[in-house]
């Protein structure tokens, strides 16, 4: 599987994943967020622990799919822009993951902030 390393590291979830499952993945990956994709691995957005918390406070259930709370305005890069990742991390200290997209918004990879420089 082309994207198995992203799935294995709990950095990406299908849009039908429940809020509860997403929160478990975010806890496991220790990055505060996950990328969200459809069945064809087309990028749909990001879900952070903050989005989950706000959704639960506003009455969402843990069984609701993350497609209901996905942030479609998260920072992304195109394949030919990977070198800009460090600049984005410096400009946006709250960002821990940057999805790398190809033509048609297919998720190709995720750049992960160096944990030694993670926002505290």
Language model regions located:
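Bateman (tandem CBS) regulatory domains
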Residues: 1-11, 64-74
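Short, flexible segments with low predicted structural confidence
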Residues: 24, 40-41, 61
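Short beta-to-alpha loop/turn elements within the nucleotide-binding domains of ABC transporters
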Residues: 17, 47, 64
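The conserved cystathionine-beta-synthase
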Residues: 12-31, 37, 56, 75-95, ...
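Phosphate-coordinating loops and pocket residues in cytosolic domains that bind phosphorylated ligands
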Residues: 57-58, 71
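Short beta->alpha transition motifs characteristic of CBS
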Residues: 28-31, 35, 42-57, 99, ...
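Cysteine-rich, disulfide-stabilized extracellular repeat modules
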Residues: 9, 43, 62-65, 107
């Amino acid at each position: 599987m082309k994207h198995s390393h992203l799935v294995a590291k709990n950095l990406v979830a299908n849009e039908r994943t429940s809020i509860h499952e997403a929160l478990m993945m975010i806890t496991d990956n220790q990055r505060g967020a996950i990328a969200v994709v459809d069945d064809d691995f087309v990028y749909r957005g990001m879900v952070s622990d903050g989005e989950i918390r706000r959704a639960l406070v506003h009455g969402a259930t843990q069984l609701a799919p993350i497609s209901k709370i996905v942030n479609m305005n998260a920072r992304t890069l195109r394949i030919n822009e990977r070198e800009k990742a460090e600049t984005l991390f410096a400009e946006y200290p709250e960002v821990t993951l940057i999805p790398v997209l190809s033509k048609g918004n297919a998720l190709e990879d995720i750049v992960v902030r160096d944990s030694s420089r993670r926002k505290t």
